[in-house]
Amino acid sequence: MTSSAIRINKKPVVLSGIQPSSGMLHLGNYLGALKSFGRMQDDYTTYFMLANLHSMTFPQNPEVLRENTIRIAAQCIAAGIDPAKSIVFLQSDVYQHNQLAWVLGNVCIFGEAARMTQFKDKSGKQGNISTGLFTYPILMASDILLYDSAFVPVGADQKQHLELTRTLARRFNAQYGQTFLVPQPFECSIRIYDLQDPAVKMSKSSATESGTIFLLDSPDKIVKKIMRSVTDSEDVIGYDRETKPGVSNLVVMYSCLTDCTIEQTVNIYSGKKYSVLKKDLSDILVEVCTTIATRTNELLDDKNYIRKILVTASEQARGVAQKTIDRVYEKLGVY
């Protein structure tokens, strides 16, 4: 294992991240983001950010957040984010994120931020919301633009935020001259749904824990959750999100874990009962999650090693970010 600095080269930059507000990653995080990001590490300069500043948009227990950050870092590394290939850093350790966010906040028009559907959805469900929730997309834009990110993996819920980032980059460039690289989306089409309510995404905050496979779940829990997952009465394995959302969800999981296409998976299980697919999927998930859990526990036995990775990577990220801030401040006349 190594925590030495990653050599920055001329490969296109890909930036991704995850909030450590919960100490548990689930299957949706793994298949929808971590697995594909892990495969990018050889072909791109990859930054993976533990977005603890974004976690502050809702109240956090400081000690719990600190512990969860280490736990999430361990799980991400165990799931394939290699600190020898990626710059795995802590957002709060790179103060330039806040510096650029202030600049971009003065480039963003109030109405643009107010139109963000995620803000409208969350603010509609909460009572007293923070200004930080409103400015969340601006900080996200700062995260992306600081590192000259060429590509950003995004799901459907973040596409609007990335489009705002692109708008702000183009606006700044038009006003002050070429400064920012305008990032392109890597659209993540993989969506894993709740096992008990396949109309909604799998989430750490599902209505019932049985709807979510956590990467650190025990083998028994994984088997029970899969075998009890909602399907339908037809017992015909196929893929149709409208009429067969439950079994379609299982088909997607199997396909992602085995690198099969949807069509190949459906053909493999043609004429077989749901129980056969569930049994095979359970076996695969137990193997994958046990491997991740074992590695996670090894890493958590030496938390100082994880902290050293984050400190080293954050120092390197600051060096890159400062070059962007210097460029921006010079254009603005505040340097």
Curated annotation (Swiss-Prot):
- Reactions catalysed, as given in the entry: tRNA(Trp) + L-tryptophan + ATP = L-tryptophyl-tRNA(Trp) + AMP + diphosphate + H(+)
Record-linked PROSITE patterns: AA_TRNA_LIGASE_I
Q: What Gene Ontology molecular-function terms does this entry list?
A: ATP binding; tryptophan-tRNA ligase activity
Question: Where is it chiefly localized?
Answer: cytoplasm
Q: InterPro entries, from UniProt?
A: aa-tRNA-synth_I_CS, aa-tRNA-synth_Ic, Rossmann-like_a/b/a_fold, Trp-tRNA-ligase, Trp-tRNA-ligase_bac-type, Trp-tRNA_synthetase
Motif 'KMSKS' region: where in chain: 201-205
Q: Which SUPFAM superfamilies match?
A: Nucleotidylyl transferase
Physiological role: Catalyzes the attachment of tryptophan to tRNA(Trp).
Family membership? Belongs to the class-I aminoacyl-tRNA synthetase family.
Q: What is this protein called?
A: Tryptophan--tRNA ligase
Q: Which organism is it from?
A: Tropheryma whipplei (strain Twist) (Whipple's bacillus)
The major lineage groups are: Bacteria, Bacillati, Actinomycetota, Actinomycetes, Micrococcales
